[in-house]
């Protein structure tokens, strides 16, 4: 087949270009073989590999250089794609019998040799522990630490097997409880045995360190050299079997306990007397043992875990608190079915004087231990260590072999299992609370008691970082049982102990004796007749417990011994009150307090937690053991109590007392009382409603006083900023005239307000007195407010020059300006003077009428309003005069008019359409009427209609208001949105002018052409008339205080505009006719009234005289001294109002007559 030469040459060119990929367009380099391939191909021509971007997730082949997968929309950026080296193969799963998450990780599997060494170490530790238990009965703390060391090693190897750890703890606890009972009762102490135990402890520590090295070696094993998991199981099985064997031995010991045998008081008392006599020697030896135990704990227990110790009730209370802190034992008498709820609260070391409830972190622990364990009577918590107290029946029957195991199991199953609550609270110590009531044993005058309580030689004057030590209650056993029989629920008592870092509170539920009533609780044993020795022992333990807190002590206080004499008790009561005041107050949510009844028994707590409830919502927080004053009949059997209790405070009464104190403090208007409130209450309320009203009013008053102080301070700082940032630097660039025109008397205002603020924060004057005294000085604001508009015009003219503009730009970068310009600062004096009456009125409303500052506030409000009214009227006069001068200069054809007459002032101006060719009798179409647009100027006695040409006005006509009448026209000739009114001259041949409203609105002359200033509040919706201090009897229509910006009245609709003009002209006409009928004498006399009264006392054109009467009533009723001249003025005003009503009816009848 012949091929055309042109086609052959074209194909050769194409082939050459495909080979020379770098010189071709639309070619991409293959990532595999790095050869060029056209982009149109999906595979490489050389190696057939993919050219496009393949998704690393769904393996979809996308376009070249695409950023996202078309199918799964995943990002295809190279940085987001994981490298191949980072993806490791999935390890092969090997089934093993032990469900341990740690053993699956092969990096920590020990070798066979290491397992054998661990077993040998464990056997050695167990042998050492057995030797220590046999040789030393008094040093149970060393044995306990050795056992804990072994347990820590076991738990580190089999960390996941939680049940085995629990069983191990249970087994060790049984040995500990036996050792405790023997140590407490025993009389001998062998120092040689202590040394042997210390050596054993050191040996055990060495073994433990060797076991710890196993973990370091195991974590550094290579992943490639793995041994089978079955090889690591054998040491664990041996450990578990060893634990189970020890558990069986302990169960035999527990089964040997006798059944509910009645407690023999003689045995327990003999044991206690033995301990009492040897307490001094035991304390010395225990101190040596505690040092050794502390070293063992530091070496082995890296992560502190609170454990449980077991001890008897009476000796555990007598023991040194240092020993209790360092014992870490695990009880064996916790039942399987018990649900233990733990609330952890973490205490912070803080020296602030208030108590704050911390956050709670709650969880629940179910202790799965042996069901045949003995019952728990009470718990004592110390630094996270729980000490269980065994009943006296259990203590007395340890050596008795006559028992029935079935009966024991049945009795234990019938008893309700208590619930244990552990809480560690985040507290801020110490709260400043009111002094608690005096303890009864200090106030009671017991003549028959001969007991002397010897307190410690040095106690703390203020305890900042600690809470009270565990208290001991001692009472008659028989009286206790009699009272407990009458209780409806099982009582509970708690003993709270804390250190500087942890606060632990526990609630202990005491189990009843099976042979007595369930309500009878065995908690306190009879004391020996020799009370002096037992109390001395208690005082020694208390002294040791307080000495353990030396790290947080700052001051010490010596207390003399408390005897039966009343004088010594009273002398020491104040010292004890100082100690009690330093303790934190009880929690506000659950103020459950165990109290002693009059017969000496322990009162049951009605709010104790329910054992069947698994949650810990109803946790009983027994704060302290309280004192009870015995009756005269029981003085012989009364036994004193030694305790450092938490203050027992009724929080509801305390809150009410604080509220009453606050109400009393807020009743005083002194500023110093607001900042530093007094602690004494001067007023009390009889009912809850009155108390609530006083508190609400006092809170509002306090907020208002704070607002006045803070805003005044900010205002003084702003005035100082104007002077230092703007005024003084500009004096170098501008003349003195320009500086006075811009800043006016700003420095004088700053001096006055600075003195005002100093008087407000003083301790001698009240708010009303300060403003009443400083009211005359505030008149300087009149000059500033009158020339404020001129100040803004001068500033705008100054900013037009480039040099000054750059200077102001540099000033705006200063931080004290807060991003505001000079205009924002110059308006602040105008705003502040108008805010004073508003703040004082609100403060007057929030002040009680019987308050001593109430009449002063009324007087201050009256004076400030009068000053503000004067400033407002003067400003209106100034603006009216300035506008009138502009009109005279720009008005043509009004040479004969005297617009600057003394009794004449401008009120309104705006646009109107003059209707030409309109008659009321003839109905004509709208097309035949002609409208001529013009501008009107309404004075108080004159109406002008002009035609505007640029900035000038040409007068078309004018008329006196006392010669015309006004009528509202209703005709079909005008649209519905057009309002028409007519002015008709009185008399034969009088002229008539008909006007129609336009789109433009009328405005009050007092705020026309201004950008900021003072405006009357009622003029925002209607252009009402105002008097600038005229003598024609026309007073100000509006209120005297307000703030405006710009021509705010230019947004009214057309109907309101026309109604405003119509109503204003009508009232002005009525006003002029009233002046004619009343005569010039009455007019001149009436004009003198506003000068002696408040600016609000003038009559308004709209007939609203309520402001007049209200202001008059305030001035007459509120002022403490009402003069006879004010009463005469009030009577004259009432006569004038009656005459106005009579004349107004006559004027309206004349105005409504149609010509």
Curated annotation (Swiss-Prot):
<feature type="compositionally biased region" description="Basic and acidic residues">
    <location>
        <begin position="320"/>
        <end position="330"/>
    </location>
</feature>
<feature type="compositionally biased region" description="Low complexity">
    <location>
        <begin position="1093"/>
        <end position="1121"/>
    </location>
</feature>
<feature type="compositionally biased region" description="Low complexity">
    <location>
        <begin position="115"/>
        <end position="153"/>
    </location>
</feature>
<dbReference type="GO" id="GO:0005829">
    <property type="term" value="C:cytosol"/>
</dbReference>
<feature type="region of interest" description="Disordered">
    <location>
        <begin position="259"/>
        <end position="333"/>
    </location>
</feature>
<dbReference type="InterPro" id="IPR025874">
    <property type="entry name" value="DZR"/>
</dbReference>
<feature type="region of interest" description="Disordered">
    <location>
        <begin position="604"/>
        <end position="639"/>
    </location>
</feature>
<feature type="region of interest" description="Disordered">
    <location>
        <begin position="484"/>
        <end position="508"/>
    </location>
</feature>
<feature type="compositionally biased region" description="Low complexity">
    <location>
        <begin position="161"/>
        <end position="211"/>
    </location>
</feature>
<feature type="domain" description="DH">
    <location>
        <begin position="700"/>
        <end position="874"/>
    </location>
</feature>
<protein>
    <recommendedName>
        <fullName>RhoGEF domain-containing protein gxcJ</fullName>
    </recommendedName>
</protein>
<feature type="compositionally biased region" description="Polar residues">
    <location>
        <begin position="304"/>
        <end position="319"/>
    </location>
</feature>
<feature type="region of interest" description="Disordered">
    <location>
        <begin position="114"/>
        <end position="216"/>
    </location>
</feature>
<feature type="coiled-coil region">
    <location>
        <begin position="192"/>
        <end position="257"/>
    </location>
</feature>
<feature type="region of interest" description="Disordered">
    <location>
        <begin position="429"/>
        <end position="460"/>
    </location>
</feature>
<keyword id="KW-0344">Guanine-nucleotide releasing factor</keyword>
<feature type="compositionally biased region" description="Low complexity">
    <location>
        <begin position="441"/>
        <end position="457"/>
    </location>
</feature>
<feature type="compositionally biased region" description="Low complexity">
    <location>
        <begin position="604"/>
        <end position="637"/>
    </location>
</feature>
<dbReference type="Pfam" id="PF00621">
    <property type="entry name" value="RhoGEF"/>
</dbReference>
<feature type="compositionally biased region" description="Low complexity">
    <location>
        <begin position="260"/>
        <end position="303"/>
    </location>
</feature>
<dbReference type="InterPro" id="IPR053086">
    <property type="entry name" value="RhoGEF_domain"/>
</dbReference>
<comment type="function">
    <text>GTPase-activating protein.</text>
</comment>
<dbReference type="InterPro" id="IPR000219">
    <property type="entry name" value="DH_dom"/>
</dbReference>
<dbReference type="Pfam" id="PF12773">
    <property type="entry name" value="DZR"/>
</dbReference>
<feature type="region of interest" description="Disordered">
    <location>
        <begin position="1084"/>
        <end position="1155"/>
    </location>
</feature>
<feature type="compositionally biased region" description="Low complexity">
    <location>
        <begin position="1128"/>
        <end position="1137"/>
    </location>
</feature>
<dbReference type="GO" id="GO:0005085">
    <property type="term" value="F:guanyl-nucleotide exchange factor activity"/>
</dbReference>
<keyword id="KW-0175">Coiled coil</keyword>
<dbReference type="InterPro" id="IPR035899">
    <property type="entry name" value="DBL_dom_sf"/>
</dbReference>
């Amino acid at each position: 087949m012949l091929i055309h030469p042109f086609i052959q040459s074209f194909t050769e060119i194409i082939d050459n270009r495909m080979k020379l990929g770098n010189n071709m367009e639309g070619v991409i380099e293959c990532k595999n073989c790095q050869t060029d391939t056209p982009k149109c191909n999906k595979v490489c021509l050389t190696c057939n590999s993919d050219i496009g971007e393949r998704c690393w997730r769904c393996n979809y082949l996308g376009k070249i250089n695409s950023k996202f997968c078309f199918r799964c929309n995943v990002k295809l950026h190279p940085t987001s794609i994981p490298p191949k080296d980072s993806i490791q193969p999935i390890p092969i799963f090997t089934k093993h019998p032990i469900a341990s998450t740690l053993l699956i990780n092969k990096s920590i599997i020990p070798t066979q040799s290491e397992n054998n060494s661990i077993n040998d170490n464990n056997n050695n530790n167990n042998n050492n522990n057995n030797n220590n238990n046999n040789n030393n009965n008094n040093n149970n703390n060393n044995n306990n630490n050795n056992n804990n060391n072994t347990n820590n090693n076991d738990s580190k190897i089999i960390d996941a097997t939680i049940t085995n750890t629990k069983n191990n703890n249970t087994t060790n606890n049984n040995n500990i409880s036996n050792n405790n009972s023997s140590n407490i009762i025993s009389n001998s102490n062998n120092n040689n045995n202590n040394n042997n135990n210390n050596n054993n402890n050191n040996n055990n520590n060495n073994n433990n360190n060797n076991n710890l090295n196993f973990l370091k070696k195991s974590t550094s094993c290579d992943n490639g050299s793995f041994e089978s998991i079955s090889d690591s199981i054998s040491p664990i099985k041996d450990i578990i079997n060893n634990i189970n064997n020890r558990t069986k031995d302990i169960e035999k010991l527990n089964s040997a306990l006798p059944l509910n045998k009645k407690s023999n008081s003689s045995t327990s008392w003999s044991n206690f007397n033995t301990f009492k006599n040897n307490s001094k020697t035991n304390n010395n030896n225990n101190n040596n043992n505690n040092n050794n135990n502390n070293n063992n704990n530091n070496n082995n227990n890296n992560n502190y875990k609170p454990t449980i110790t077991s001890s008897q009730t009476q000796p555990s209370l007598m023991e040194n608190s240092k020993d209790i802190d360092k014992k870490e034992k695990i009880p064996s008498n916790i039942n399987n079915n018990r649900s233990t709820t733990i609330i952890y609260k973490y205490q912070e070391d803080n020296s602030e004087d208030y108590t704050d409830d911390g956050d709670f972190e709650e969880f629940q622990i179910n202790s799965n231990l042996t069901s045949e364990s003995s019952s728990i009577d009470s718990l004592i918590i110390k630094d996270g260590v729980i000490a269980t107290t065994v009943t006296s029946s259990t203590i007395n029957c340890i050596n008795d072999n006559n028992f029935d195991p079935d009966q024991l199991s049945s009795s234990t199953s019938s008893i309700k299992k208590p619930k244990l609550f552990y809480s560690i609270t985040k507290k801020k110590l110490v709260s400043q609370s009111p002094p608690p009531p005096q303890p009864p044993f200090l106030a009671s005058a017991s003549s028959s008691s001969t007991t002397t309580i010897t307190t410690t030689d040095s106690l703390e004057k203020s305890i900042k970082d600690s809470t009270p030590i565990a208290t001991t209650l001692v009472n008659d056993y028989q009286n206790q049982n009699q009272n407990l029989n009458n209780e409806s629920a099982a009582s509970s008592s708690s003993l709270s102990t804390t250190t500087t870092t942890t606060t632990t509170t526990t609630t202990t539920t005491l189990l009843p004796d099976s042979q007595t009533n369930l309500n009878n609780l065995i908690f306190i044993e009879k004391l020996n007749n020799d009370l002096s020795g037992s109390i001395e022992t208690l005082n020694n333990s208390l002294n040791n417990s307080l000495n353990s807190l030396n790290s947080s002590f700052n001051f010490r206080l010596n207390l003399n011994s408390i005897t039966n004499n009343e004088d010594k008790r009273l002398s020491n009561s104040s010292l004890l009150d100082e100690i009690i005041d330093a303790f934190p107050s009880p929690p506000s949510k659950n103020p459950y307090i165990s109290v002693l009844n009059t017969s000496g028994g322990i009162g049951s707590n009605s709010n104790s937690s329910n054992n069947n409830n698994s949650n810990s919502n109803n946790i009983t927080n027994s704060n302290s053991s309280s004192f009870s004053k015995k009756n005269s009949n029981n003085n012989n059997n009364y036994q004193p109590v030694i305790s450092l209790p938490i203050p027992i405070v009724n929080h509801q009464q305390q809150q009410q007392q604080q509220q009453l104190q606050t109400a009393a403090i807020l009743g005083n208007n002194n500023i110093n009382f607001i900042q530093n409130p007094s602690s004494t209450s001067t007023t009390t309320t009889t009912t809850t409603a009155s108390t609530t009203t006083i508190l609400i009013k006092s809170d509002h008053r306090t907020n208002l006083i704070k607002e006045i102080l803070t805003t005044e301070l900010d205002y003084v700082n702003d005035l100082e900023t104007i002077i230092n940032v703007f005024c003084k630097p500009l004096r170098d660039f501008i003349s003195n005239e320009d500086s006075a025109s811009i800043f006016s008397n700003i420095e004088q205002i700053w001096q006055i307000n600075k003195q005002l603020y100093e008087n407000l924060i003083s301790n001698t004057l009240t708010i009303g007195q300060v403003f009443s005294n400083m009211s005359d000085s505030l008149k300087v604001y009149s000059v500033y407010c009158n020339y404020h508009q001129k100040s803004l015009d001068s500033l705008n003219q100054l900013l037009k020059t480039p040099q000054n503009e750059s200077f102001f730009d540099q000033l705006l970068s200063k931080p004290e300006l807060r991003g505001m310009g000079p205009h924002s600062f110059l308006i602040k004096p105008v705003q502040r003077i108008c805010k004073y009456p508003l703040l004082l009125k609100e403060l007057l409303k929030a002040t009680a009428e019987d308050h001593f500052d109430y009449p002063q506030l009324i007087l201050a409000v009256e004076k400030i309003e009068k000053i503000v009214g004067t400033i407002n009227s003067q400003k209106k006069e100034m603006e009216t005069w300035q506008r009138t001068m502009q009109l005279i200069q720009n008005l043509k054809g009004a040479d004969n008019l005297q617009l600057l007459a003394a009794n004449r002032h401008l009120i309104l101006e705006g646009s109107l359409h003059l209707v030409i060719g309109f008659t009321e009798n003839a109905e004509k179409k709208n097309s035949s009427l002609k409208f001529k647009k013009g501008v009107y100027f309404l004075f108080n006695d004159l109406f002008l209609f002009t035609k505007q040409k640029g900035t000038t006005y040409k007068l078309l006509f004018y008329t006196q208001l006392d010669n015309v009448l006004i009528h509202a026209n209703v005709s079909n000739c005008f649209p519905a949105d057009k309002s028409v009114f007519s002015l008709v001259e009185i008399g034969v041949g009088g002229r008539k002018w008909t006007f129609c409203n336009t789109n433009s609105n009328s405005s009050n002359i007092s705020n026309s052409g201004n950008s900021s200033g003072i405006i009357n509040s009622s003029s925002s919706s209607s252009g009402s008339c105002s008097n600038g201090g005229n003598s024609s009897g026309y007073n100000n229509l509006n209120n005297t205080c307000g703030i405006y910006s710009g021509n705010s009245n230019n947004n009214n609709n057309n109907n309101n505009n026309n109604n405003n003009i119509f109503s204003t002209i009508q009232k002005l006409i009525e006003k002029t006719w009233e002046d004619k009928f009343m005569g010039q004498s009455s007019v001149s006399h009436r004009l003198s009234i506003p000068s002696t009264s408040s600016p609000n006392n003038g009559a308004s054109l709209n007939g609203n005289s309520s402001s007049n009467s209200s202001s008059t009533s305030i001035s007459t009723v509120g002022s403490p001294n009402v003069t006879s001249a004010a009463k005469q003025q009030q009577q004259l005003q009432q006569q004038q109002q009656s005459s106005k009503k009579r004349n107004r009816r006559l004027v309206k009848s004349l105005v409504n007559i149609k010509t």
